[in-house]
Structures are given as C-alpha cells and as structure tokens.
C-alpha cells in the first residue's frame, strides 16, 4: 500500500480531532495512513508517498520553524496542500489578494506595529460598537481580542505587549457571529462536500469546539455556494482541501477566512464526508 502521513503535532489532548475517520476510506483506496508530528526531527519523509497537513494546531507558536519543515517535506515527497498555497495562506494578508479579485470580505485595518490611538479610532472608522484584533499569523483564536470602547482601557497593557512589534489586523466585530453563527463550507478537490454552522457559547465570540462552540450540519443556500465558488476561483492554485468561513454581513455573505493549512474538516458531523475526501483525493492526485 502507498503511505500517507497526516501531519499533526506532538500533543492534541486539548483539541478535538477527527482525522482517524479518514483511515478506513483511505485504506479502501490503497493508502496506509498514519499520524506524524511536524515537530518530530527523526522522521524520514521520503518513506511517504504523500503528506497531508492536518492538525498542526501549534504552528503559529513557531511559524518560521513550521515553514522550514514544510519546505523540507516538500523536497522529500508530495505535500498537500501544495507548498506554495500553504505559504500564501499562512499570513492572513492573503485576504488582500482576495479583495482585489472581488471576494466579499469584512473590512480590515492592517497594522505592522501596535498603535492604541488607531485602535480607538477604528470604532469610528468602521462605525462599529465592537472590534476584533488578532495577529496576521494565528490559529485557534490565539491572541484574539473582542473589544468595546468600554473595555479597551482594561486591555491596553496586554494589547501593547501582544502586538508591540507584531503584524495584526483590526476588523469590526460582526454581530451575526454571536446572533446567528459562522458558517464553514468544506471543499474537497474543488467540490463542495458539506457545510456546518458554528455558534459560540454565551458571552463568547470564539466558535471553536475547544472554546465551547456548538457545531451543526446545515445546507448551503445558492448565494453561500456562489460566494464559496468565487473564493475558490480566486485562490492562486488548486487545493486538495479548503474550508471557507463566511458570515452574514450587511445583507449578504462575507468571507471571514479561507483555511488551507490545517482546518478541522469535521468529518464527525457528516458520516459520508471521509469517503468523499478519499474519493476526491484519488481524482485530485491524478489530475495535478
């Protein structure tokens, strides 16, 4: 059987991981899958026919080391998503290129160094009662803050410490995240697989399971699919997998993020999605 490494990290105890649901569908198609940490320096990546980035959910702590490891793996075997796409997606400034191509997005201020006055002015700039600030290289909502005019001063010292010399982004807080939820569209080999809605727990804005978010399988509306397909077409190259996070914004849908590195694909919520992934992978590898 061909060997595929599902790239992960050393410790997943605090995370919900569903990639084991891929093992049997992949085996049915001639692939022996095993989970391997990107931090393991003893691995000979050339023994694998394919490496798929999956649950590397600590890469944001050492992004330079992560990039070096991806580059090393890419020299030894086939890496998916493609290295060029992973590097493009690792910094959220990729959203700028999507904006140029007309993808509907949440308005964003991009900062290289932290300026508290700019943060305060952003409430007026965006005509928003709340803001979200986060690093441009981040995952799992790490170092992400939901701010209001009333609590900014309380967070000032922590914000200055967190973002002093760290590229970051400021966006208006989108109330639909807490009032309705954030939707995720999952694409395997360019085809829509399934859609879920993620809602945060009470008094929170983070939709991840690890932060108490609730998840449910839903159907996509035609407009949601249109935005998803428009976003896919705006990517620099094809992807084996993609998760497009969208939210209702000003009577339409806006893209929050496009996850091409290590998105949870929530195979647990759709029992046939692991089979769809394995089948899409088979066709994708043949044509790319």
Where are each of the predicted segments found?
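A short beta-strand motif that forms the metal-chelation/ATP-contact edge
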Residues: 48-53, 184-187, 252-264
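Short strand-connecting beta-turns/loops that link adjacent beta-strands
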Residues: 138, 190, 249-252
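Conserved N-proximal alpha/beta basic substrate-recognition cap immediately N-terminal to
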Residues: 10-112
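Anionic group-transfer/hydrolysis microenvironments
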Residues: 10, 56, 136, 173-174, ...
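Phosphate-binding site of ATP-dependent enzymes
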Residues: 148-232, 236, 247
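Active-site nucleotide/adenylate-binding loops and adjacent lid/helix of ATP-dependent enzymes
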Residues: 2-8, 70-76, 84-180, 222-226
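ATP-dependent carboxylate activation and anion-phosphoryl transfer catalytic cores
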Residues: 222-288
């Amino acid at each position: 059987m061909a060997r595929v490494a599902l790239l992960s990290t050393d410790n997943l105890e605090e995370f919900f991981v569903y990639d084991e649901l891929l093992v049997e569908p992949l085996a049915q198609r001639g692939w022996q899958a095993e989970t391997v940490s990107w931090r393991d320096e003893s691995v000979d990546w050339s023994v694998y026919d394919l490496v798929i980035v999956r649950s590397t959910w600590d890469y944001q702590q050492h992004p330079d080391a992560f990039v070096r490891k991806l580059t090393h793996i890419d020299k030894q075997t086939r890496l998916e998503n493609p290295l060029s796409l992973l590097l493009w997606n690792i910094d959220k400034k990729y959203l700028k290129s999507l904006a140029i191509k007309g993808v509907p997005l949440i308005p964003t201020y991009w900062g290289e160094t932290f300026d508290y006055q700019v943060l305060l002015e952003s409430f007026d700039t965006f005509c928003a009662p709340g803001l979200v600030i986060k690093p441009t290289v981040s995952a799992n909502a790490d170092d992400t803050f939901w701010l209001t005019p009333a609590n900014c001063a309380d967070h000032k010292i922590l914000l200055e410490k967190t973002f002093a010399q760290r590229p970051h982004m400021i966006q208006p807080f989108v109330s639909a995240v807490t009032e309705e939820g954030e939707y995720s569209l999952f694409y395997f080999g360019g085809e829509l697989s399934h859609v879920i809605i993620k809602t945060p727990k009470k008094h929170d804005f983070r939709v991840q399971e690890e932060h108490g978010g609730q998840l449910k399988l839903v159907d996509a509306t035609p407009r949601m699919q249109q935005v998803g397909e428009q976003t896919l077409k705006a990517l620099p190259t094809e992807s084996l997998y993609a998760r497009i996070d969208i939210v209702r914004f000003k009577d339409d849908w806006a893209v929050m993020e496009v996850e091409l590195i290590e998105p949870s694909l929530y195979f647990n919520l759709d029992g046939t999605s692991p089979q769809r992934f394995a089948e899409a992978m088979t066709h994708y590898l043949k044509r790319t």
